[in-house]
Amino acid sequence: MKKTGRLELTWVGKYDDKVIEPRILLEDASKSYGDPSSENMLIHGDNLIALQALQQDFSGEIKCIYIDPPYNTGSTFEHYDDNLEHSIWLSLMGERLILLRELLSEES
């Protein structure tokens, strides 16, 4: 007997499209070091905006991405509140995971 159903996570706001203003990445030469011909980048900033900025030039080409997403620990920190409703947190993570998948190369 074949089962054709599939499991899907659903939450409030999952399908709400958000428009984020496009940005470009600017190099800060004072923070660069090492081999100037290196293909590696370290980007300091909001990871969602940075991932979107990478899309135009690097879609499907990146081998490894490390981001520091909101973890939803339930704690409040000095610079941000990490205590979101789960539906809001899932929407935040969903946006980032979709961009990550689009940026990563096949061999990643």
For the regions a language model picked out, list residue spans one by one.
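DnaQ-like (DEDDh/DEDDy) 3′-5′ exonuclease domain used for proofreading
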Residues: M1-Y66, T73-I88, E95
